[in-house]
Amino acid sequence: MTQDSYLVGLIGSGIGPSLSPALHEREAGRQGLRYHYRLIDIDRLGVGPEAVGGLVRAARDLGFDGLNITHPCKQLVISHLDTLAPQAEALGAVNTVVFEDGRAVGHNTDVTGFAASFARGLPDARLERVVQLGAGGAGAAVAHALLTLGAGHVTVVDALPERAAALAVALNRHFGDGRAAAASPDTLPKLLTDADGIVHATPTGMAAHPGIPLPAELLHPGLWVAEVVYRPLETELLRTARALGCATLDGGGMAVFQAVDAFRLFTGREPDSMRMLADIAELAGTAAVRH
């Protein structure tokens, strides 16, 4: 018998403004489901990201059906799970945990979420040379999505050089030598002069982490600029890029399409992505999500 009641949650830092509860609960309500989505904010709990394992175990013991995982726990959570779906294993990052027969199974819906959003929002973007800011959990997913979409070369830039290097090695192992490289932030002026586009995949610009992730003067109209941050939908980076005439993509589409895949994993039911795109534009107080 298909169940009609679900308890899920989100573990992360600074997640108070998250729209995930409303996105999931609205769609569930339209499908006649009782669906409760709870925020488990490590900042409010007064614990560090290393507590993610205990939080996952507690959720399982309390009868949760699944969890979403966000910054800064997407990689730390892996050692606390029973098994990983192939894509999560390839990425080394998990954003969705499903509890199945007492086992915690890690998935990653960020890859398909970003790929679907990019294909819809920037369908004509050149992908020969892409610069990506961020090599964390979201960054790993975005880089996989870019190369899956056919990017010729992705250069990963991160404040932690060893993290960027490790991601580049993993990408080349998965997609073939020469498809990815790591670079330090001080090389951005040269990189962006030659690039077709830039993807931002760090927390900078989120409500809890305001700011812009690179010097604004490095942007130019020849770049497309894609963002993974979705709260706010218009980050300082996107506002600056749009004013310069860059084609831009906000993080709303990725948020919706990864939620679509997570909802399907949690419930076994097919959500309506178009309704959810309308939801996020309404919830964020703007019609900025144009897909």
Swiss-Prot record:
Keyword NADP set for record:
yes
Q: Where is the signal peptide?
A: none
GO MF entry, a single one: NADP binding
| Pathway(s) | Metabolic intermediate biosynthesis; chorismate biosynthesis; chorismate from D-erythrose 4-phosphate and phosphoenolpyruvate: step 4/7
**Known EC number(s)?**
1.1.1.25
A Pfam family this chain is assigned to: Shikimate_dh_N
Keywords of the record: Amino-acid biosynthesis, Aromatic amino acid biosynthesis, NADP, Oxidoreductase
Reactions performed catalytically? shikimate + NADP(+) = 3-dehydroshikimate + NADPH + H(+)
Which InterPro entries does UniProt cross-reference here?
Answer: Aminoacid_DH-like_N_sf, NAD(P)-bd_dom_sf, Shikimate_DH-bd_N, Shikimate_DH_fam
Record-level GO BP terms: amino acid biosynthetic process; aromatic amino acid family biosynthetic process; chorismate biosynthetic process; shikimate metabolic process
Coiled coil region boundaries: none
Q: Provide the assembly information.
A: Homodimer.
| Family, similarity comment | Belongs to the shikimate dehydrogenase family.
What is the protein name stated in its UniProt record? Answer: Shikimate dehydrogenase (NADP(+))
* Organism expressing this protein natively: Streptomyces avermitilis (strain ATCC 31267 / DSM 46492 / JCM 5070 / NBRC 14893 / NCIMB 12804 / NRRL 8165 / MA-4680)
Query: Taxonomic classification, please?
Result: Bacteria, Bacillati, Actinomycetota, Actinomycetes, Kitasatosporales
Q: Which gene encodes it?
A: aroE
